Curated annotation (Swiss-Prot):
Together with its co-chaperonin GroES, plays an essential role in assisting protein folding. The GroEL-GroES system forms a nano-cage that allows encapsulation of the non-native substrate proteins and provides a physical environment optimized to promote and accelerate protein folding. The keyword Nucleotide-binding applies. The gene is groEL1. It is an enzyme of class 5 (isomerase). It holds the Pfam family Cpn60_TCP1. ATP binds at residues 29-32, 86-90, 413, 494. The keyword NAD does not apply. Belongs to the chaperonin (HSP60) family. InterPro entries: Chaperonin_Cpn60_CS, Cpn60/GroEL, Cpn60/GroEL/TCP-1, GroEL-like_apical_dom_sf, GROEL-like_equatorial_sf, TCP-1-like_intermed_sf. This is Chaperonin GroEL 1. It is found in: Cytoplasm. GO terms for cellular component: cytoplasm. It catalyses: ATP + H2O + a folded polypeptide = ADP + phosphate + an unfolded polypeptide.
Amino acid sequence: MSKLIEYDETARHAMEVGMNKLADTVRVTLGPRGRHVVLAKAFGGPTITNDGVTVAREIDLEDPFENLGAQLVKSVATKTNDVAGDGTTTATVLAQALVKGGLRMVAAGANPVALGAGISKAADAVSEALLAVATPVAGKDAITQVATVSSRDEQIGALVGEGMNKVGTDGVVSVEESSTLDTELEFTEGVGFDKGFLSAYFVTDFDSQQAVLDDPLVLLHQEKISSLPELLPMLEKVTESGKPLLIVAEDLEGEALATLVVNSIRKTLKAVAVKSPFFGDRRKAFLEDLAIVTGGQVVNPETGLVLREVGTDVLGSARRVVVSKDDTIIVDGGGSNDAVAKRVNQLRAEIEVSDSEWDREKLQERVAKLAGGVAVIKVGAVTETALKKRKESVEDAVAAAKASIEEGIIAGGGSALVQCGAALKQLRTSLTGDEALGIDVFFEALKAPLYWIATNAGLDGAVVVDKVSGLPAGHGLNASTLGYGDLVADGVVDPVKVTRSAVLNAASVARMMLTTETAVVDKPAKTEEHDHHGHAH
């Protein structure tokens, strides 16, 4: 396919226009008084959402050069969502402000490379400053506060707080759609681990990018599966049962993986394959834990169980399995509660007699996974549109709560970013030339999230930013009440991990856009047909 090429200022301007179209659409959702965006769908009714990454994912622009800018900023939102599960709108408005300020400096003659280096140094300094003022999260009340701020819903916050408090920091919180109108919390047996699907073709829920298997069989395999003749007899038996299949193995590759993908696409067999976590003896022990949870056996030639020869009696089961690109949750495994309890007691006995601190730590992790169980938040609503929106809110709240446990919390509402600007003043004195200008650009960009939170709440953003800049650390605007005060005490908090991810990802994309000198895109088909030049119209 032939290409269109733009250079220098023309390329950067087109990309900035595209970035602004996406960011201006997303930023209206920021803050407790943020607005909604209605997304038309090719099939079914429209989706109403105030989730930044959901909006960003839907945007593709007609002009290919503008679309480059939009897709770059979209990557900020998706990367922040992948790392922290929240903070996507904050990341987007930060990136927009950085690019806008940076391009102004470049137009005035600043060196883009030096400017970008200054922006990167500023991002690192702000990241360190945020960690320095973080408050550790402990207890149900603190987790509830974080979840409530993220979801803008006290009921959701309370459910997430209760669920995470019960299953512990190593426990799993799963979100499902309810068959009733109520949103409620259930505790069930289950286990989760940090490995996702081996192919995106296994995805069954395209909105959440997850593979969801209801009432599946579970195949646990100690070794790598690459040969189709080895796997095919089992696939045929599972297909006859009419049930979906989860495969957990050292790896699945070659024709075995290809066959599983083809069967999933054709819907002959609903299946998902994931790698088993860990290595060596730890992997072996974890698979044995999974076997007890699911009521199955680990297929291992060393113990006389060869995959091509075994029947479905070695398979475990579960009520539900949810697999994303990063993790797997097995809910309500088919193993007996007595067997799980016996395994937990056995592991605790091993902890007592172990001389190795490392071994004790790893054994305790296994106990936490087995004993913690799974908290399932079942989301209900009157309409399908309301259900999707509410489920997104719950998922964001769970992600924010997990992030807050990892790195602590800071004052929310954009105030912490404005007040972290003080850390940049000292850094600026150590830099010269265009690198120092990068610090100035970043200093101004830090005001953007608070500015838009205030603007969306009907206030004058510039006035609010000026006022908060002069308040004591941790104080700021509570956009829900439109008052000022101690935000942590008022429960207006953000997870540090979320804010740091937003800062670092926004800086990375801004630096890329500022140093772009040439943009190359495919020539749109309709432009080729009419032999037009330049952008598509």
